[in-house]
Amino acid sequence: MTHKREIQGVVVKKSGDKTASVLVTRSVLHPKYHKTVKRFKKYLIHDEKNELNVGDSVIAIECRPLSKTKSFRLKTIVATGVK
């Protein structure tokens, strides 16, 4: 069985039917200055039931490519955003 990557982030945009854009933040150590800096990346995730809203905190799991840019599907909703 293969290991599937999991990402945790915040929904920043509803990108069409059954798709949401999730912003993932990670901390890395700067190679020269040895200070922790934040790095950001957006992923498109598949939301089969259209249950996500902007501001929700979610966990997504890697899956087979569903489109040109979408390779993650929704696993759980950790917290709901502001209504």
Swiss-Prot record:
GO terms of molecular function: rRNA binding; structural constituent of ribosome
Keywords recorded for this protein, A-Z: Ribonucleoprotein, Ribosomal protein, RNA-binding, rRNA-binding
Protein origin, superkingdom: Bacteria
One cellular component (GO) term of this entry: cytosolic small ribosomal subunit
Subunit: Part of the 30S ribosomal subunit.
Role: One of the primary rRNA binding proteins, it binds specifically to the 5'-end of 16S ribosomal RNA.
Protein name: Small ribosomal subunit protein uS17
Organism: Aliarcobacter butzleri (strain RM4018) (Arcobacter butzleri)
